Design a protein with these regions (language model features):
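A cross-kingdom marker for long, charged
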Residues: 233-256
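Generic structural signal for short, solvent-exposed loop/turn connectors between secondary structure elements
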Residues: 1, 21-26, 238-240
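Bacterial N-terminal signal peptides that target proteins for export
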Residues: 1-7
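Cell-envelope/glycan interface and biosynthesis
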Residues: 29-30, 34-237
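N-terminal export signals
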Residues: 7-23
């Protein structure tokens, strides 16, 4: 049977990844399960919060271009890209940056809006690397993030001394700022992220060449592995890499 030129063009224009309805519902189910203190259930195409708030997920809508989702993400968009836990198999594919696509409305409701004040009332001080180079850092108590980071720190202190130079000093946790290329709040604005030693790290914007992003990383996976065990994802697994960066995103990674 002859294939028309229009059929070929439509096929080429289709999204590379198409989420089936059942698959999309399963991913949204993982989102609800990841935040039991805040999310009650999935009701059709709506996430119901424990306070009764109903939030549309965007389920059933066609997948949009990466740059559009990055700046205007639905909850379904937030769950589209799978985070590859475990040792890296190689550089991330083009635009595969699981965790960068996120709904600002979702996280502002969960952690508070630092631009309006009061979010810091949910923070407490965590001492970063107390046996190596103590440094007080504010971290959110929502979703037990502060407690989980303390577990990370305890394990990092057990690593060989040769790895400590990648960790200290930390480049910070809470910072009420936006992401440079999107204008949306960073996970640092929720005090749910930490940057390790910037002097030993790499960032995609520093290395961009003629529209391409050559992958660079100096952070040993032994460090990222400790964070992943507590459900922090690593920016070193993003196409738009940020190798100093870790953020608490339990909907994207399993763990205790």
């Amino acid at each position: 049977m002859a294939v028309s030129r229009r059929t070929i063009l439509c096929a080429l224009a289709a999204p590379l990844f198409v989420t089936r309805p059942a698959e999309g519902a399963e991913r949204l189910g993982r989102l609800v399960a990841a935040y039991p203190h805040h999310l009650a259930r999935l009701d059709g195409q709506v996430v119901v919060w424990t306070d009764g708030t109903r939030m549309e997920t965007g389920a059933g809508r066609p997948e949009r271009p990466f740059e559009v989702m990055l700046r205007d993400a639905t909850l379904t968009d937030q769950m589209r890209q799978a985070y590859p836990a475990g040792p890296p198999a190689g550089p991330p594919g083009r635009n595969h940056s699981p965790g960068r696509i996120r709904s600002t409305a979702f996280f502002v409701k969960m952690y508070g809006d630092c631009r309006r004040g009061g979010a810091d009332r949910r923070h407490r001080t965590v001492t970063w690397m107390p046996q190596t180079r103590p440094q007080p850092l504010p971290v959110t108590t929502e979703n037990d993030v502060a407690t989980r980071l303390e577990r990370v720190i305890a394990e990092l202190e057990r690593l060989p001394d040769r790895l400590k130079a990648y960790l200290v000093p930390s480049s910070g946790t809470f910072n009420c700022r936006t992401v440079a290329d999107t204008g949306l709040l960073s996970m640092h604005a929720y005090a749910a992220a930490i940057d390790i030693n910037v002097a030993r790290s790499d960032y995609w914007s520093w290395a961009r060449e003629r529209g391409d992003i050559p992958y660079r990383n100096r952070i040993p996976f032994e460090i990222a592995e400790v964070f992943e065990a507590q459900r922090f994802i690593w920016g070193g697994k993003w196409y738009h890499y940020d190798t100093m960066h870790f953020e608490y995103r339990p909907e994207l990674i399993g763990g205790a």
